[in-house]
C-alpha cells in the first residue's frame, strides 16, 4: 500500500506555472501599442530598458500597451512604475492593470484625483491618489495616497475552494485592498500599462504633457482555463 501511494504521488501531474519578467531591454517584444485618441504618432519609447508612455496636454489621449498573450490566470502580477508629479486638477492616469473585457478588469490607476477622491485618501498636497478597482462582479474601488516616484504595484489572484478568486492589491509590499470576486480561472487576462487622460481622475483637461515609466512588468501565474475573448 505504501509503495502504491508513493507511486501515485510521483505520477500526479503538477500544476503548470508560467513565469516571466519583461525588462524592455528588447523593446516591447511580446507587447503591442494601441490608443484611443487623435495622436498621429505612437506615444511610447524605450530608453536604457525603461518603457516610457506619454500623453499630450489639452487632449484626452489614451496611450496603452498590452501583452500579445491573453491566457494569464491565477497568481501574482507586478509592475515597477514611475509616477510623475501631477499638477492639481489635471485629468491623467498612470495605469498598471489586467483586462479581459469591460466586466473583467482589475486596475491600478494613479492620478491627482478629484477633490472627493483626495479627501477619501487623505491625500496631502505633495501626494497623488492610487485608485484600485475591480470593474464588475462586484464593482469596487478604493483610493489611497502615495507620493510621486517609483512604486511596486502588485495584483494577486488567489484561488478559493469555490473556484472563485480573492483579489489583493498591494503597493510597495503592503496589501491595500482585498476583495472576493465572482469569477475565477476560467477568465484569461491580458496585462496592460497605460497613460491616459481620464476625466474621473481629476477636475480639468490636462494642462501638461505626462509620461509614465515602467522599469519592468512580471508575473508568476497559472494559465487560465478558458481564454477566448468575449
Regions found by a protein language model. Name each.
Residues 7-8:
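C-terminal motif of bacterial Sec signal peptides marking the signal peptidase cleavage site
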Residues 28-52:
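Extracellular glycan-recognition surfaces and repeat-rich motifs
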